[in-house]
């Protein structure tokens, strides 16, 4: 409707002036001007916009480097010749992109309260100068300012987001159309060589957004790839489906017999929400229509959906595991659907070619995929941990289970965290700086990344191990899809710095919960296995303690099935099933399902002996029937020594009694451990260290 009105308004002068062109004034700063381009007259966003709009429009560039929106700023736009020229030209459409230079400490701290009034005054000046035209005004959210801007942490970062909020308020207050120029560029730092100015490719993205806003052409009806035939819709919660269509288009949806409709917004986005459904074992259909196009999804199941993520031990496939034959022999009778996000190129010991490097920069990292019904081939190539987790859920709950896997070998946890969260974190923001030389990031990750991208000539070349990258390519595209929770197997690429990982992990969980707008979303993870790497005992114990700090978060032990030299143990079925036990007990309320091995509650001195009490065990025993191994004690000043269960200690139900007094107790503290403590369910105890009190 808004474009119909605009067309009618514009039609009057067109009729009178015999096909007079529609004038588009691009008002702005150096980004509009095309600063940094070899030839702005050919590659600036207004020039590219002209090419997109065609001969029916005349686009002019009124950008001036350093211009501020604030009239008391260091270079007010209203005092510049470009402003006067734009007013005199009498445009039909005005696209305003100002505010970046107002983040200067000379401007925003002093005159922020005048921003709203100054912005409104510029808008009204275009209208007042030519009241017969009343030009259409587009207000733009600013393009990004990235972390390597010289003033990023000293104020620019925070003032930038404050200005973005003001701009949004201005658009709402005057019912002006808002164009979000950060929408696509915020995840493309490779297009901003100086952290501020988009290169020609970035300018083309801006031009495309402005083109779509002016013409309402957003490419017609489209949905994220996560929606497809065979998908599993999360039971028990309303199902929201998102997509894009041409602005103002009526979007109609039908989920079986339930109908719903909406209108695509000014930015082309829309969403439809359908009533919550329960699993019923039936096949369902969803149909979406808009812009003369119809998209239908069939064979949809209602059930449980889980995200399965991390690095190579989560990506480790069923066909590589020691349980391959048993896994494939038992796929019948379970309805498990797989959404398997495989990378276009693996982070192997190779140099990637130019095609791969360009694809990574454009976020074309994961191979496009669809939901698949389980069969021998699909299961063979799917994550072994994830599949065994899903199989146990399907058996126990009796409902279809959908598994989304986006794990990437070698990936550090920080690559899965969203950019805004990291940018605003007082410590983790430093991960972003020169990440390929940054010792906050594991040296192996940096070395492998350097090898993979050795052929790139772009100093801002992207890589899956870069902070935020896997969030932008592997989490953001599926964030619209309702899930029950997440399972996570990762840590090998963060084990170099236990204390830093604790901060990263807490931030990761928080990032995902905000992404899915679910502060209590369950997050279950695998504690690292055992291997001859010195830092791993400390890391495993840190993971144990992390689980006690984060609500609705818990871990599964895997140190009992490690390997002294292979970081990829092949025993994956027990790991997936231990994760499933956590979900069944805690999330699904099946409290009879044992979820943990013996867990230390306290250690104290009694009658000259050291007593350790455990929960999650009526009787402590061993996995191999031999004497208990792996327990160590230390005196007040001495080192740790092994406890001999032949002569020094005994097991009494859920207690261990050690002769003499100790000050600290450790268990399974060797990098590769043969510790063998389990409970009556056969579930192993975690690595731990506790103080005797």
Explain the meaning of each model-derived region:
Residues 19-20, 51, 77-217, 467-559, ...:
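Alpha-helical cap/lid subdomain in secreted, periplasmic
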Residues 21-26, 31-120, 299, 305-307, ...:
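Conserved SGNH/GDSL esterase-like catalytic core that processes O-acyl groups on lipids
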Residues 242-326, 397:
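Extended acidic/polar, glycine-enriched regions
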Residues 1-20:
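Bacterial Sec-dependent N-terminal signal peptides
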Residues 219-247, 298-308, 315, 586-602:
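Non-catalytic, glycine-rich low-complexity segments
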Residues 26, 339, 346-381, 484-493:
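Short, conserved helix/loop micro-motifs enriched in His/Cys and acidic residues
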Residues 225, 234-237, 574, 581, ...:
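Surface beta-strand/loop "capping" patches
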